[in-house]
Amino acid sequence: MATITVVKARQIFDSRGNPTVEVDIHTSNGIKVTAAVPSGASTGIYEALELRDGGSDYLGKGVSKAVGNVNNIIGPALIGKDPTQQTAIDNFMVHELDGTQNEWGWCKQKLGANAILAVSLAVCKAGAVVSGIPLYKHIANLAGNPKIVLPVPAFNVINGGSHAGNKLAMQEFMILPVGAASFKEAMKMGVEVYHHLKSVIKKKYGQDATNVGDEGGFAPNIQENKEGLELLKTAIEKAGYTGKVVIGMDVAASEFYSEDKTYDLNFKEENNNGSQKISGDALKDLYKSFVAEYPIVSIEDPFDQDDWEHYAKMTTECGTEVQIVGDDLLVTNPKRVAKAIAEKSCNALLLKVNQIGSVTESIEAVKMSKKAGWGVMTSHRSGETEDTFIADLAVGLSTGQIKTGAPCRSERLAKYNQLLRIEEELGSEAIYAGVNFRKPVEPY
């Protein structure tokens, strides 16, 4: 049995130039693995604690405390442990070494979710190498998933909300090549639509409008949300993929929810007169009008993270034709997932490992979601690294969907390219989720 001999953390930088945590693990049989954690821009208030240093260095965003917690507390406690025992190691870190809890479970406020997760990811990678199997297969084994499926990529090609400097309230407009026969073909479709979209935007809004945002998407000076959908529809048509490439949205509505329980579609305009503030019901009806007019299959965070009422209404009214994805609502937290299942608040989980802070808890949230008949979309964060763990995670858990940005910017392509490698490695056994992206496998 190989055991952990070294756990070493350092501060590196994410794709936005902000510090983040990277961890190396060495084992007794000479293996060395490295894992790095991402960070988000629009973060849900219920996410586990991302520990930052504060102060003036790096504008308060340094992670030397989290790095110190790995090097001085977590690391020494893991020496001699077997890296294949993921659940035991995660539970030891979360319950014993950290031990902080709030009403939603283990909140990692002592050591930081970024410290614990970096180690959890590295342990998972080490466990795979020690077991002599690919990472995706190791993850499938940890979850008890017998059938591996490649996900449909959801490319975020138009950016608004907190990710962009335009007037657009809604944060992401995505394309999903569900009509492809393989992941490789899905990449081809996505890339071609992306380039057609670039031409359409350049022609309509000028060269500057094709500058890319944090996730590689375009942020043209669009005034309203329907304009974004219209651009996607045009680009899909020009690429010749009408019916094969469909649309998803991430509204990130918590970003424009007001104290008075209204949603301000003009929230980015300073000193605005409130003329575009609408009720939750009016916003729901706006989504329904979009769904009637465009090939929309997925809407993420359509309401505020505490607006359980409108989530449930929306899921009841359109949940069969559209997946209603909980991100800020659920924050990959098993307790919040359980509440949403009980209240029928949504019907899909957005899986972000750094919202909850360990591989084991992420697997638990996915298994609960699948048992409830939900879809699962694996996701990056807007501040990413070159780490490709989530590509293997999406395959190993057969989530059926992954969003990790546009087919642009190396930290995004790193994940898509890893999925191409995995598909090639699986050969004739490779299955692409395609139109079954919401339920690619039976619950495991």
Curated annotation (Swiss-Prot):
Top-level enzyme category: lyase
Residues of the active site: 215, 352
Entry's cofactor comment: Mg(2+) is required for catalysis and for stabilizing the dimer.
Single GO cellular component term: chloroplast
Main location (coarse class): cytoplasm
Binding site for Mg(2+): 250, 300, 327
Residue pairs linked by disulfide bridges in the UniProt entry: none
Pathway(s) of this molecule: Carbohydrate degradation; glycolysis; pyruvate from D-glyceraldehyde 3-phosphate: step 4/5
Alphabetical keyword list: Cytoplasm, DNA-binding, Glycolysis, Lyase, Magnesium, Membrane, Metal-binding, Mitochondrion, Mitochondrion outer membrane, Nucleus, Repressor, Transcription, Transcription regulation
Entry EC number(s): 4.2.1.11
Subcellular location: Cytoplasm, Cytosol; Nucleus; Mitochondrion outer membrane
Molecular function GO labels: copper ion binding; DNA binding; magnesium ion binding; phosphopyruvate hydratase activity
Signal peptide: none
InterPro entries in UniProt: Enolase, Enolase-like_C_sf, Enolase-like_N, Enolase_C, Enolase_CS, Enolase_N
Record's catalysed reaction(s): (2R)-2-phosphoglycerate = phosphoenolpyruvate + H2O
Keyword Transcription regulation (UniProt): yes
Residues given in the record as substrate binding sites: 163, 172, 300, 327, 379-382, 403
Described function: Multifunctional enzyme that acts as an enolase involved in the metabolism and as a positive regulator of cold-responsive gene transcription. Binds to the cis-element the gene promoter of STZ/ZAT10, a zinc finger transcriptional repressor.
Annotated family: Belongs to the enolase family.
Subunit (UniProt): Homodimer.
Protein name: Bifunctional enolase 2/transcriptional activator
Gene giving rise to this polypeptide: ENO2
